[in-house]
Amino acid sequence: MLSNLPVIFLMGPTAAGKTALAISLCEHLNTEIISVDSALVYKGMDIGTAKPDASELARAPHHLIDLLDPSETYSVADFRRDAIIKIDEFHQQGKVPVLVGGTMLYFKALIDGLSPLPEANVEIRAELEAQAAQYGWPHLYQELVKIDPQAAQKMSENDSQRINRALEVYKLTGKTMTELQKQKQPVLPYTFHQFAIAPTQRSELHQRIEKRFKIMLEQGFENEVSTLYLRKDLHPNMPSIRCVGYRQMWDYLAGEIDHDEMVFRGIAATRQLAKRQLTWLRSWPDVTWLTTGDEENLHRVVSSLS
């Protein structure tokens, strides 16, 4: 059992080189990787998510990948629960857990905890949607302004998903979203060593994203998505199909866009994802930045543990 319970975070935008560094780190520390990626949890979605291949998995076992069928959903709370179980297992074995990925909300949930919000309720959602169909979302928004003005301030009067959720929470608990979000879980007893990796130039990251998307196409990404498309039980509003690249390929297979447009949109969506990830990281407290391709990266991470 490790005394100060160290946990390494290796965060960064998509295509920044996280996996390569993480595998080197695992070989050096004789440990394993916990994936922090909302797309890698899905089975049968390997190429478009850049899931580690067999040789990479042999060098460094990855956990929290291939957990679910693409028809299922995986919440932030599911991740937090599963990650804590794995972290504690590693600590019991005397290993330093290495958490790697770009789903920043998952990392945040580990550090800050989650509010005790209730599960979605189908009946209440349907009731609210029926009211919205009759009176419009701006009418329901005004209701929310009276109940929870602070939550309402953070959304527009046509943000149906968030208005619905805020009113649903109030109907289920009698408490506002704002009240419940202040009730966080206890802080975890770990020492977090937090690193973010990215190229210094945005143009380099864009080149890496474009190159990777084209490699995915060569590896058979179209066939991978076609298999999902032909199942008929999946649709583009599911979290799995909303993953970057999959949604654009889905639209192409549905005949809504041509091949060139699919490639253009796929690369553009991946760039947007990387931009959002970097925005999170620039305001992230206690993070040490690493430059993609720097030979000193491994040494910097390892030396932080001593």
UniProtKB/Swiss-Prot annotation:
GO MF annotations in UniProt: ATP binding; tRNA dimethylallyltransferase activity
The keyword tRNA processing is annotated on this UniProt entry? yes
Q: Where does ATP bind?
A: 12-19
The annotated site for Interaction with substrate tRNA falls at 103, 125
**Could you say which enzyme class this protein belongs to?**
transferase
Under catalytic activity, the entry for this protein gives: adenosine(37) in tRNA + dimethylallyl diphosphate = N(6)-dimethylallyladenosine(37) in tRNA + diphosphate
Residues in a coiled coil are none
Q: Which UniProt keywords apply?
A: ATP-binding, Magnesium, Nucleotide-binding, Transferase, tRNA processing
What are the names of the required cofactors? Answer: Mg(2+)
In short, the EC number is 2.5.1.75
Does the keyword ATP-binding feature in the UniProt annotation? yes
What is a biological process (GO) this protein takes part in? tRNA modification
Q: Which residues bind substrate?
A: 14-19
Q: Where is this region: Interaction with substrate tRNA?
A: 37-40, 161-165, 242-247
Pfam families referenced in this protein's UniProt entry, alphabetically: IPPT
Under Gene3D superfamilies, the record lists: 1.10.20.140, P-loop containing nucleotide triphosphate hydrolases
Oligomer and partners: Monomer.
Tell me the protein family, please.
Belongs to the IPP transferase family.
What function does this protein fulfil? Catalyzes the transfer of a dimethylallyl group onto the adenine at position 37 in tRNAs that read codons beginning with uridine, leading to the formation of N6-(dimethylallyl)adenosine (i(6)A).
Q: What's the protein here called? A: tRNA dimethylallyltransferase
Source organism (scientific name): Pseudoalteromonas translucida (strain TAC 125)
Read off the lineage from the record.
Bacteria, Pseudomonadati, Pseudomonadota, Gammaproteobacteria, Alteromonadales
